Curated annotation (Swiss-Prot):
The keyword Zinc-finger does not apply. This is L-threo-3-deoxy-hexylosonate aldolase. One of its GO terms (molecular function) is 4-hydroxy-tetrahydrodipicolinate synthase activity. It catalyses: 2-dehydro-3-deoxy-L-galactonate = L-glyceraldehyde + pyruvate.
Length: 335
């Protein structure tokens, strides 16, 4: 099947919403949220990432979230917005199986972290190489590597390893939640990652022939919204960040300003975004959902054992991101 190409721009790891009383999936809100983000100009969504509380869901629930997100986008006219699924297990066999289930549910790409439960045995370069390339061999959808040391017992893949793994034709990108812009620069340069057009980056990269033939140019994702502009200046392709659930249009605005060559304005927008994103980062999933509730009228709470914010804490989060939200609300939808 032809896959929707990954484009430069802003992506969000979407939240999974639950009934506040029963903790059952709140499917209408999951669908509404996906469409809101697409209207704001996001060019791709990740289901079942860290922000999506994948570790709190059953496999059946994961498939439901992916399927409902995909169908909501298509029905709203956003069939060109691909769904990426977090599909990580600890074994090669289990990860391939989850990739297949994600594909059946409507995902076009899979986001994969290194196996880490047996870190003493799996945290070496050769084992990680074999893990990712074996999964890529068996997956029906292309893979995006997910370098997130904080979630995988400190395993931090260096640029040499990422470049080596990414020679596989079914591996098409990396998400750098390690926030290492030097590493991102080296990987983006070595793999000829796509970059958005801009007078600030006149030498646009050409796709490697192997990836072009497969219609899969390489994508280097900045993994946190507070270095969106830095990602672009480093030759990166896109941002895939939790803050885009709350302030998507401000994230898109930074990309638009960069593309227009308006660096000073882009830097001013980045400063505002960085301050707000730090509030959301510290407040984590409960705080991000609380911010969505405060400013959009839905959001609710995470599944237990994640704690709910108190009314005072929720009010504090909303107040601290107020300046960014004023700009967010002033910006038009893109689509």
């Amino acid at each position: 099947m032809p896959f929707t190409p990954l484009r430069p721009g802003v992506y969000a790891p979407t939240m999974t919403f639950f009934d506040p009383s029963t903790e059952d999936l709140d499917v209408p809100t999951i669908r509404k949220h996906a469409v809101r983000l697409a209207k704001a100009g996001l060019v791709g969504l990740v289901c079942m990432g860290s922000n999506g509380e994948a570790v709190h869901l059953t496999r059946a629930e994961r498939k439901t979230v992916i399927n409902e997100t995909r169908s909501a986008l298509v029905e709203a006219g956003f069939s060109n917005v691909p769904v990426i699924a977090g599909a990580s297990e600890q074994s090669i066999r289990g990860t391939i199986e989850l990739c297949k289930e994600s594909y059946e549910a409507g995902a076009e790409y899979a986001l994969i972290v290194p196996p880490s439960y047996y870190r003493y045995a799996t945290g070496n370069d050769q084992t990680l190489y074999e893990f990712f390339t074996s999964v890529a061999d068996g997956s029906p959808i292309p893979l995006i590597l997910y370098n997130y040391p904080g979630a995988v017992a400190g395993i931090d893949m260096d640029s040499d390893l990422i470049i080596r793994i990414s020679q596989h034709p079914n591996i098409v990108g990396t998400k750098f939640t390690c926030a290492n812009t030097g590493k991102l620069t080296r990987v983006a340069s070595a793999l000829h990652a796509i970059t958005p057009p801009s007078p600030l980056a006149p030498a646009q990269r050409k796709f490697p022939s192997t990836k072009t033939e497969a219609n899969h140019p390489y994508v280097a994702f900045g993994g946190i919204a507070d270095f969106s502009l830095q990602t672009l200046a480093s030759g990166g392709s896109a941002i895939l960040a939790g803050g885009a659930n709350v302030i998507p249009k401000l994230c898109v605005q930074i990309f638009n300003l960069w593309s227009a060559g308006r660096f000073t304005e882009a830097m001013e927008a980045q400063e505002l975004l960085s301050r707000a994103d730090w509030v959301l980062t510290k407040a984590a999933i409960p705080g991000t959902k609380s911010a969505i509730q405060s400013y959009y009228g839905y959001g609710g709470f995470p599944r237990r054992p994640l704690a709910r914010l108190s009314a005072e804490q929720a009010e504090a989060v909303a107040e601290k991101i107020k300046d960014a939200m004023e700009v967010e609300k002033s910006l038009p939808d893109i689509a």
